[in-house]
From Swiss-Prot:
Organism domain of life: Eukaryota
Protein name: Alpha-N-acetylgalactosaminide alpha-2,6-sialyltransferase 5
Gene Ontology MF annotations: alpha-N-acetylgalactosaminide alpha-2,6-sialyltransferase activity; sialyltransferase activity
Region of interest called Disordered, as start-end residue ranges on this chain: 32-81
Function: Predominantly catalyzes the biosynthesis of ganglioside GD1alpha from GM1b in the brain, by transferring the sialyl group (N-acetyl-alpha-neuraminyl or NeuAc) from CMP-NeuAc to the GalNAc residue on the NeuAc-alpha-2,3-Gal-beta-1,3-GalNAc sequence of GM1b. GD1alpha is a critical molecule in the communication and interaction between neuronal cells and their supportive cells, particularly in brain tissues, and functions as an adhesion molecule in the process of metastasis.
Keyword Metal-binding: no
């Protein structure tokens, strides 16, 4: 309980300074010149050409083929509402690069491969500036935890660059995301969308959050609340990617038993914090924690490994794939 109270107090303190940050956003970005339509069109053409050229990795595999003459259009996705207009998210990608924040990406030179993918997905405040050779430069979707909003605002010039057309999905406890005037995070997101009207900001609804909890219970047999678990942004991002993408290439995610090897290489938890905590130390401390609330990183990776046995998920940097099992996983994607 004390840990939860401290978590709540920390969030409240962050929210008290958010208005000041938003004013800075208004002054620095409110008058920012938009990229001319011609440049936007050229950028879109370049991205389409990159997707068409393919790469050394397998191309996207789609379960259905679009009939000639029938216009393709993404269907609305339940549970993701626009902050400004409350309209559902419409997005679909043939192939996606889900770029983790792991230190395994340092010196990987995977950037060009990532940028050739149709849609590039990133998490929280993971930067591209200065790391493009390893993690790429494009961002199609960024999934952001409520606790990372302050860091997003501090790096707004890079992370809130509306010229890329990036979609932002914010998640958080339902009490922070209420739309009745009492949801502090939602209120600030709504203000941000007014300051930056071209920002494609979406939030996960309360009902969808409950579905994410239920999915965790179905896949692990553990109740999230009873087990004192906070779902990680990686959990939300992987599940969202399964809804959006026909194929998912995951960069920087280790297999669930990686940290058991006493000779595993030591890498930073975040590639952009080279002197930060060790990745396996972070994973193990959260997995074993019982008092307070923790992320169950290794448990989540076991689920992802299991999904990859059936669904079109592939892991790179490090490269690995799950061993086959005699019993097949159900062929329906774990979404609601």
């Amino acid at each position: 309980m004390k840990t939860l109270m401290r978590h709540g107090l920390a969030v409240c303190l962050a929210l008290t300074t958010m208005c000041t940050s938003l004013l800075l956003v208004y002054s620095s970005l409110g008058g920012q010149k938009e990229r001319p339509p011609q440049q936007q069109q050229q950028q879109q053409q370049q991205q389409q050409q990159a997707s068409a050229t393919g790469s050394s990795q397998p191309a996207a595999e789609s379960s259905t083929q679009q009939r000639p003459g029938v216009p393709a259009g993404p269907r609305p996705l339940d549970g993701y509402l626009g902050v400004a207009d409350h309209k559902p998210l419409k997005m679909h990608c043939r192939d996606c690069a889900l770029v983790t924040s792991s230190g395994h990406l340092l010196h990987s030179r995977q950037g060009s491969q990532i940028d050739q993918t149709e849609c590039v997905i990133r998490m929280n405040d993971a930067p591209t500036r200065g790391y493009g050779r390893d993690v790429g430069n494009r961002t199609s979707l960024r999934v952001i935890a409520h606790s990372s909003i302050q860091r997003i605002l501090r790096n707004r010039h890079d992370l809130l660059n509306v010229s890329q057309g990036t979609v932002f999905i914010f998640w958080g406890p339902s009490s922070y995301m209420r739309r009745d005037g009492k949801g502090q995070v939602y209120n600030n997101l709504h203000l941000l969308s007014q300051v930056l009207p071209r920002l494609k900001a979406f939030m996960i609804t309360r009902h969808k959050m409950l579905q994410f909890d239920e999915l965790f219970k179905q896949e692990t047999g553990k109740d999230r609340k009873i087990s004192n678990t906070w779902l990680s942004t990686g959990w939300f991002t992987m599940t969202i990617a399964l809804e959006l993408c026909d194929r998912i290439n995951v960069y920087g995610m280790v297999p669930p038993d990686f940290c058991r090897d006493p000779n595993h290489p030591s890498v930073p938890y975040h590639y952009y914090e080279p002197f930060g905590p060790d990745e396996c130390t972070m994973y193990l401390s959260h997995e074993r924690g019982r008092k307070g609330s923790h992320h169950r990183f290794i448990t989540e990776k076991r689920v992802f490994k299991n999904w990859a046995r059936t669904f079109n998920i592939h892991f790179f940097q490090p490269d690995w794939k799950p061993e086959s099992l005699a019993i097949n996983h159900p062929e329906n994607k774990p979404v609601f």
